[in-house]
């Protein structure tokens, strides 16, 4: 598998979903020679699955300040104000930018873009294109990438980052990535002169019932983690209340936004009748609705002990066809239900990772030259619970900021600090088993951290890249050599324990059990082997590499969930049914310290540009 | 057979071929050993029948790998999968791969008909595997790669030609004029959005191109997906007349709209129900109008 090829660009963007494409366009506008490296062809990215819409305060009567207020409240006061304010201030401009690029938004009579209500918003500010907003956004942006002639290396799986070796991660810098060309099996270095932007999307495959694509294995998060970048607030996973029971395919919040109603097995409109959200009912925020549904099912008022009904028939065929047509197709194709004639079965499913790679408001991580944007990142705009329609603006706003920053444009000093410095606080955390990789024994070497394994400090960028490439070549050789456990077995063991123990409802005992199961899965991964010997399109190998990422992420997620002994947003803890602002107005951060995960905290920033967001009780 | 297996065609292909001159390397030997082991496992799986008594479906799956001895000669493998209500062709393939043969290769990602990566030839028709219910198909289910495309491995085809044709129609929005205020929309009427709406739904799956007889015979024909993309912009009122004329010129070229013989096969297979043939006809009409204006 010898290869000497190195590709060189100013800025390398990893991932071609909404975040990656926007970042690439921005970097190019700022004058950089930019390339996108993506394991899927851009139009196959999961952004295409987004349905509901993009929040942007673009109408009279609305303001970005109100949007920021709603977002902070929705986050259960775990968002950082500088990031939230950037999101809400920039979203109108970025949304209209999409319109200027031709995006096929739904329209009002006067030709302006339509908006609709979404859960947790005080104004109907969700801009949309039918129930296929993500598809329209992804394609529109890819078109602009084609127009600009930005180079795309598609079906190249990025395996690792080329990061220098200093002891303290905040002293490290990133000089590129190592890619694996799926078609040919070639491993090559991608040298980034100015910066690497990770935009690898979600990590839904950690769970078995998810709205996410099969490719959403959290690769970027895991790579950054192993290179020493902290992961922030990993315990906050959004479970969407309306997914189809058999597949996890999402039924957009747009259905409830348009007036869809939830019923339990007894035909009761339970959101009101059982007092879960007396004001907002079905439009309460997602965590509230997901818990309500499961409570109904657990208390015997579900249907077939599994799901509840979402009814949109009363909206009438015209309105459904106009605004929710795609939902009819999804219900029909994937559940065999005609939404015009029958209510649709729905249950909660993993949907979105609020946590991820720790960044500041410009997408910078604590490693110099390394950025992260989109769902893989945590600039801390969603805190403990993301509002529907707030992820797509995140892609375009932070995609643009990171692209410009990486290309060398001047910015003000960031207000959000990254890395283990400043006012952090060490955690007192006890795990039931040894975590991380150490216990795996001597072989652990082969799947070691980026360039950060404590050897002699190499600082020459080309040499750093070369070391990283060699390490991946060796890893692939070894994986192909060994004829061991199939990755699919390990992956499903992880998914099972996560679904059983780290789901919507969580308790200490189950979380500990999950860590024990994950330890076992990690040990089995030591014996993983790839049985397909081919260099052509070896998906066996790819899935094996992804499974390693799933393992690391699942562990960090569970650690965070065990440590945070309070009830906030999407994170429900049986032992502690209150939001504990006194002790927990802080982010959990987990960093990989030479193979050992290390947990610590940092206070939330509630101080905005002109005001402080005072935590209030969140009621809907 | 309807599928084309590459015979070491283009240069890039050749570059990735193992060097025949060299001594068999450690890697080659290893690969050989692996192939043997894989064959062994396959034999074992075929002998034991863990699914006896269950409601099963039989898949006949096309196999080919230019790298692996024993798979260089295309063939069909049989897999038996337990059937559950609601199971799709993609679910069945995943089951077969994860349970019997981890080298079974196909593209897939969203499993909800939006990423367009799993178009295949199933029981004689182009379909998205994730959107096709097993219960709608007769047994055995025959699964092949998209016809009229080069096969890379098993069910994976080379999409480059499809992407190139897409590129050829300048597939991006080019507004006539933009509002000066960056917070103001350029606006589009509801009626115009309706006109282009269906055309914007394309997920680039390639099913239409693969089903088209004309495209099969004429490699340069732009094909239904690219023409649909051209329609999407040519009919968008925001682009303005002169850009529209340029777009019509592109699709009027020798291998453009006039090649379409309205056989409707593209329209039949499109998983997004895009009225492709109609869009192509509409473009022909526009082209005629355009010419009348000038000649
Ligand atoms: C079904 C669904 C509906 C949603 N609806 C909405 C909505 O209505 N409104 C809203 O605001 N949000 C919505 N969301 C959330 C939002 O769509 C996602 O958070 C967002 O699209 C993620 O975009 P991204 O660019 O970060 O990642 P993605 O679009 O997932 O892109 C990830 C990219 O990274 C690449 N990649 C991954 N790993 C590697 C690797 N190792 N090497 C190279 N490339 C790699 C992939 O190829 C891909 O191109 C929805 C999410 C889902 C799942
Ligand atoms: S037009 Fe239809 S069949 Fe053709 S590529 Fe697009 S979605 Fe697929
Ligand atoms: S898997 Fe995405 S279209 Fe079928």
Regions found by a protein language model. Give the residues of each.
Chain A
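Glycine- and aromatic-enriched mobile tails/lids
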Residues: 2, 18, 26, 30, ...
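Core beta-strand elements of the Rossmann-like FAD/NAD(P) dinucleotide-binding domain
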Residues: 6-9, 184-195, 365-369
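Conserved N-terminal glycine-rich FAD pyrophosphate-binding loop of Rossmann-like flavoproteins
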Residues: 40-72, 76, 249-253
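Short beta-strand to alpha-helix junction loop
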Residues: 79-92, 125-143, 153, 210-218, ...
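Conserved redox-cofactor binding core of oxidoreductases
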Residues: 94, 101-186, 193-195, 199, ...
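Glycine-rich loop(s) and the adjacent beta-strand/alpha-helix scaffold that form part
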Residues: 195-249, 382, 388-405
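An anion/pyrophosphate-binding glycine-rich loop and adjacent beta-alpha core
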Residues: 229-337, 405, 446
């Amino acid at each position: 598998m010898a290869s000497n090829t190195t590709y060189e660009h100013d800025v390398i963007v990893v991932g071609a979903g909404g975040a990656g494409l926007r970042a690439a366009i921005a970097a190019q506008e700022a004058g950089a020679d930019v390339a996108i490296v993506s394991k899927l062809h851009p139009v196959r990215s999961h952004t295409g699955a987004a349905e509901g819409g993009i929040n942007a305060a673009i109408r009279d009567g609305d303001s970005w300040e109100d949007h920021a207020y709603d977002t902070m409240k929705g986050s259960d006061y775990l968002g950082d104000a500088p990031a939230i304010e950037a999101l809400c201030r920039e979203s109108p401009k970025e949304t209209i930018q999409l319109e200027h690029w031709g995006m096929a938004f739904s329209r009002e009579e006067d030709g302006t873009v339509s908006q609709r209500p979404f859960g947790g918003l005080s104004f109907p500010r969700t801009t949309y294109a039918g129930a296929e907003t993500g598809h329209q956004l992804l394609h529109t942006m890819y078109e602009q990438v084609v127009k600009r002639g930005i180079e795309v290396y598609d079906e190249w799986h990025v395996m690792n980052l080329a990061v220098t070796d200093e002891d303290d991660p905040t002293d490290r810098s990133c000089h590129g990535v190592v890619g694996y060309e799926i078609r040919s099996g070639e491993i090559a270095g991608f040298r980034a002169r100015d910066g690497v932007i990770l935009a690898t999307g979600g990590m839904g495959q950690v769970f078995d019932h998810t709205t996410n694509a099969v490719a959403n294995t959290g690769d970027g998060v895991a790579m950054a983690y192993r290179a020493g970048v902290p992961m922030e607030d990993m315990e906050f996973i959004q479970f969407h209340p309306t997914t189809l029971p058999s597949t996890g395919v999402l039924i957009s919040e747009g259905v409830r936004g348009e007036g869809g109603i939830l019923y339990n097995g007894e035909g009761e409109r339970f959101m009101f009748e059982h007092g879960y959200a007396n004001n907002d009912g079905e439009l309460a925020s997602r965590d509230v609705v997901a818990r309500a549904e499961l409570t109904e099912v657990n208390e015997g008022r579900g249907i077939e002990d599994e799901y509840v009904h979402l009814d949109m028939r009363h909206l009438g065929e015209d309105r459904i066809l106009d605004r929710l047509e795609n939902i009819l197709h999804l219900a029909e194709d994937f559940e065999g239900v005609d939404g015009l004639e029958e209510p649709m079965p729905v249950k909660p499913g993993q949907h979105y990772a609020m946590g991820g790679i720790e960044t500041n408001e410009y997408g910078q991580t604590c490693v110099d030259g390394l950025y992260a944007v989109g769902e893989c990142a945590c600039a801390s705009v969603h805190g403990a619970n993301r509002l529907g329609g707030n992820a797509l603006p995140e892609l375009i706003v932070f995609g643009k900021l990171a692209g410009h920053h990486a290309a060398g444009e001047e910015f003000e000093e960031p207000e959000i600090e990254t890395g283990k410095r400043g006012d952090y606080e060490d955690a007192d955390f006890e795990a039931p088993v040894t975590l991380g990789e150490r216990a795996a024994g001597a072989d652990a070497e082969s799947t070691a951290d980026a360039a950060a394994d404590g050897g002699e400090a190499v600082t020459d960028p080309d040499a750093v890249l070369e070391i990283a490439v060699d390490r991946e070549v060796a890893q692939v050789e070894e994986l192909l050599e060994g004829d061991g456990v199939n990755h699919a077995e390990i992956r499903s063991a992880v998914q099972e324990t996560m679904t059983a123990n780290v789901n919507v409802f969580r308790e200490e005992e189950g979380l500990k059990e999950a860590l024990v199961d994950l330890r076992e899965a990690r040990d089995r991964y030591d014996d993983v082997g790839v049985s397909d010997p081919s260099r052509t399109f070896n998906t066996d190998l790819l899935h094996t590499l992804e499974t390693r990422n799933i393992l690391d992420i699942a562990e960090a997620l569970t650690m965070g969930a065990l440590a945070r002994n309070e009830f906030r947003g999407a994170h429900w803890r049986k032992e502690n049914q209150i939001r504990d602002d006194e002790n927990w107005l802080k982010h959990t951060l987990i960093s990989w310290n030479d193979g050992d995960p290390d947990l610590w905290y940092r206070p939330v920033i509630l101080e905005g540009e002109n005001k402080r967001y005072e935590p209030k009780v969140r009621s809907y | 057979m309807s599928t084309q297996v590459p015979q070491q065609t283009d240069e890039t292909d050749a570059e990735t071929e193992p060097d025949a001159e060299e001594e068999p390397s450690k890697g080659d030997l290893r690969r050989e050993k692996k192939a043997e082991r894989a064959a062994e496992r396959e034999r074992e799986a075929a002998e034991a029948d863990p699914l006896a008594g269950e409601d099963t479906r039989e898949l006949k799956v096309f196999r080919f790998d230019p790298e692996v001895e024993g798979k260089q000669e295309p063939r069909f493998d049989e897999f038996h999968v337990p059937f559950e209500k609601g199971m799709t062709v993609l679910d069945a393939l995943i089951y077969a791969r994860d349970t019997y043969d981890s080298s079974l290769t196909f593209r897939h990602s969203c499993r909800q008909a939006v990423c367009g990566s799993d178009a295949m030839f199933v029981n004689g028709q182009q379909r998205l595997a994730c959107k096709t219910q097993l219960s709608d198909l007769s047994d055995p289910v025959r699964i092949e790669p998209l016809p009229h495309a080069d096969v890379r491995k098993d069910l994976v085809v080379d999409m480059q030609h499809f992407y190139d044709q897409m590129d050829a129609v300048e597939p991006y929005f080019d507004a006539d004029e933009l509002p000066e205020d960056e917070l103001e929309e350029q606006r589009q009427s509801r009626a115009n959005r309706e006109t282009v709406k269906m055309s914007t739904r394309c997920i680039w799956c390639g099913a239409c191109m693969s089903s088209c007889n004309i495209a099969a015979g004429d490699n340069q024909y732009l094909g239904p997906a690219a023409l649909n993309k051209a329609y999407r912009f040519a009919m968008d009122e925001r682009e303005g007349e002169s850009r529209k004329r340029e777009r019509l010129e592109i699709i009027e070229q020798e291998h453009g709209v006039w090649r379409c013989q309205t056989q409707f096969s593209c329209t039949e297979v499109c998983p997004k129900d895009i009225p492709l043939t109609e869009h192509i006809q509409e473009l022909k009409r526009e082209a005629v109008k355009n010419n009348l204006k000038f000649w």
